[in-house]
């Protein structure tokens, strides 16, 4: 069975756009760089050629990865999400029970996570602790920096 990869519509569009760019813009640019480096002669000591081949390998690997992710994507329509229990797509406002610092996170797919933008991966320790909880619940998160306790202040959708 192929594991589905949950993601938002925005995350899906970003993957499609990166795939398009890598196939239609980056791939031809790299092929041109390889041809140009080949024209310089001896390939065994041609740093430009080896760098271009390495870039090609990296690009083709990422294309394969993107094609796989897109094929397995399970796009979650956040506009249809509701309820008081936290699940994928929820925007959750928390307060650190020790420091009283408030934080807001949206639970998104692994490929969309960006803590600086307030988007955390569904597979992160904090998201795993939040799933199924409601406003007023407290959670304890065992993260690499140690154990932290949070209270859930709000759950929003969309």
UniProtKB/Swiss-Prot annotation:
NCBIfam families: greA, PRK00226.1-2, PRK00226.1-4, PRK00226.1-5. HAMAP family: GreA_GreB. One of its GO terms (biological process) is regulation of DNA-templated transcription elongation. Belongs to the GreA/GreB family. PROSITE patterns: GREAB_1 (PS00829), GREAB_2 (PS00830). It comes from the Bacteria. Gene3D superfamilies: Transcription elongation factor, GreA/GreB, C-terminal domain, Transcription elongation factor, GreA/GreB, N-terminal domain. It comes from Rhizobium meliloti (strain 1021). Keywords: DNA-binding, Transcription, Transcription regulation. GO terms for molecular function: DNA binding; RNA polymerase binding. Necessary for efficient RNA polymerase transcription elongation past template-encoded arresting sites. The arresting sites in DNA have the property of trapping a certain fraction of elongating RNA polymerases that pass through, resulting in locked ternary complexes. Cleavage of the nascent transcript by cleavage factors such as GreA or GreB allows the resumption of elongation from the new 3'terminus. GreA releases sequences of 2 to 3 nucleotides. InterPro entries: GreA/GreB_C_sf, TF_GreA/GreB_CS, Tscrpt_elong_fac_GreA, Tscrpt_elong_fac_GreA/B, Tscrpt_elong_fac_GreA/B_C, Tscrpt_elong_fac_GreA/B_fam, Tscrpt_elong_fac_GreA/B_N, Tscrpt_elong_fac_GreA/B_N_sf. This is Transcription elongation factor GreA.
């Amino acid at each position: 069975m192929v594991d589905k990869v949950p993601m938002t519509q925005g995350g899906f569009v970003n993957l499609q756009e990166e795939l398009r760019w890598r196939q239609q813009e980056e791939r031809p640019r790299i092929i041109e760089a390889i041809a140009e480096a080949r024209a310089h002669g001896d390939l065994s000591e041609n740093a430009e050629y080896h760098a271009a081949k390495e870039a090609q390998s990296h690009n083709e690997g990422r294309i394969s990865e993107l094609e796989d992710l897109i094929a397995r994507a399970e796009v979650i329509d956040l506009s249809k999400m509701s309820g008081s229990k936290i699940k994928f797509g929820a925007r959750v406002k928390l307060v650190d029970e020790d420091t009283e610092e408030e934080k807001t996170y949206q639970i998104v797919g692994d490929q969309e996570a960006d803590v600086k933008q307030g988007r955390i991966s569904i597979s992160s320790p904090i998201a795993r602790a939040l799933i199924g909880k409601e406003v007023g619940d407290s959670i304890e998160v065992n993260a690499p920096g140690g154990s932290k306790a949070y209270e859930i202040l709000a759950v929003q959708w969309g």
